Amino acid sequence: MLKSFKTEIDPTEEQKIKIHKTIGTCRYIYNFYLFHNKERYDAGERFMSGKSFSVWLNNEYLPGHPEYFWIREVSSKSVKNAIENACTAFSRFFHHQSSFPRYKKKGRSDVKMYFVKNNPKDCLCERHRIKIPTLGWVRLKEKGYIPTSKDGYVIRSGAVSMKAGRYYVSALVDIPAPEADGNLTDGIGIDLGLKDFAVVSNGTVYRNINKTARIRKLEKQLRRAQRKLSRKYENLKKGETTQRANICKQKLKVQKLHHRIENIRTDHINKVISEIVKTKPSHITIEDLNISGMMKNRHLSKAVASQKFYEFRTKLKTKCAEYGIELRVVDRWYPSSRICHCCSSIKKDLKLSDRIYRCTCGYIEDRDLNAALNLRDAETYEVA
């Protein structure tokens, strides 16, 4: 099976220049593909696929425009992957899965340097370093995390990314699939929410990490840093003596705070999933939440986005597949909070402010725990 490993790297100054150059070229090619297809559409011509654009770019456009020689100086695999990503964005738009593709702005877009294993010695990994095509050997900050080539593991592909002044490598490694454990316990249900991040049917409650003093302190620092950056831009517009170098420094401070908060939230999700999977349930049932609809509520949108429900579901699905656990997804219209777990009656007048579920049969339970129990015992579901 293929498994991804992502860790921070410590490139040299020369390697940093190559990474910046490759990422910048990939961003330019992505935007050029969008622009070229827009021009063709305005001229009444047919849409050009990614493969056709790659042939046209290399055989017709670049030979006639020698000033763009720098495109050929970076890895061709990275350029081709940027074209494929742009083509996928158009495909999603044509199938009404997303909006029209937008240009990637410098410094604000998640563009990666893609690499692939073509030869046996292209991608190798040792305990303290990794070999990347066009970069050579790059030191790893976390030693021993990526499986080494010495132990027989093979890196199929990967990507180098940059965020808040830090560099990361993500490697796709071919590893043997773990054996399914036959000693599984009873199934569980998980109710996700805003008051608590997750309530499990076995009684375990995972707190909302965004309500902790640690996150609130960082968010306060972030608001101050953003105000400081905004004032620098205002002074620059007025023609005062704010230097552009100081703006870049302040932008980096804001990016580091964003990155720190995101890492804490992601780490919390990873630990919750790991703890749930270690209980070895036969199945896990979750609800198909309408995240896009919840985001339309301006009073809840920030809280919903901070919980990262979609990332939780994606990672839980991967872990369940890895350990042989069945992941069940219940329809979003299933009234898990309104059903009494004792007598199965539906309480139609239940309000969002009612945190305790009280049924006429005498059953009293926490609202979220009652929902988790109903999800565990749901009979109508889809296997993710």
What are these regions (language model features)?
Residues 52-166:
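Acidic carboxylate diad motif detector
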Residues 3, 148-151, 163-384:
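Positively charged, helix-rich recognition surfaces that bind polyanionic ligands
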Residues 30-37, 41, 90-97, 196, ...:
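A generic secondary-structure signal for well-formed alpha-helical elements
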Residues 18, 22, 78-82, 268, ...:
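Short amphipathic alpha-helical segments
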Residues 38-42, 94-100, 282, 320-327:
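Surface-exposed helix-capping loop/turn segments at secondary-structure junctions
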Residues 1-79:
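Gly/serine-rich nucleotide phosphate-binding loop at the start of the catalytic core
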Residues 33, 82-93, 369-379, 383:
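Stable alpha-helical structural segments in soluble proteins, enriched in small hydrophobic residues
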Residues 4-8, 137, 157, 187:
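Well-ordered beta-strand positions in beta-sheet-rich domains
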